[in-house]
Amino acid sequence: MEMNFPTFLILKKINISVCPKFTLKEVIQQTIFSISPNDSNKMMAGELFEVNENQLKVVSLDGHRISIRNVTLKDHYENTKVIVPGKTLSEISKILGGDNEKEVLIYFSANHILFEFDQTIVVSRLIEGEYFRINQMLSSDYETKVTINKKEFLDCIERATILIRENDKKPLILNVGDNTMELKLNSSFGSMNAELMIHKTGKDIMIGFNPKFLIDALRVIDDEEINIYMMNPKSPCFIKDEDATYIY
């Protein structure tokens, strides 16, 4: 089927990147959950797509949490930094197949992004403005590092959330010791207390988290074990792998 597009979209293509279909779908699914659910801040309603030579970085945040995925591309491309609406990415994720052999062509222009795959073309306006300074939010410092089985940790948190109403903000308390981590949650429906085996480097710590935020991140991580980095009870923690291909 012949498709006609506005001339300005064709003329203003200034850059192109190529990414496997499976990789793009995975990257979107692993970041889309932490965009802002409303449009109160337009930057938080989109995701940063940043190409630096052969590296693609995708970032989303909602004011409470941040998701970052770093992907190595096959070739080197012109450096580009744009903000793509989350609604566009959600729709693309739905129609992208899981084929890792086929590729998605991604065209960037000053005001638009164009995705081309499987005889399908998706064009979207970009969100105008400068994205947040992500590097200022990230720190490599930590006082405590916990390595834990991801499935056991996720299963335990999901059991705990049975005791919480949807809008209840009861924190999940993590009490980190030498070889174990205690998980505690109290609500009007009851209480939960569980203990998991861990490998710890650094100090003991007791810290509370929104269990939903942990669940959202853990569900999209494929690793069998995860590393959690913590500074103190009032600072954010980071879940990331050794190569920083993902950071939550």
For each feature predicted by the language model, list its residue ranges.
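Structural preference for solvent-exposed beta-strand-turn elements
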Residues: 1-248
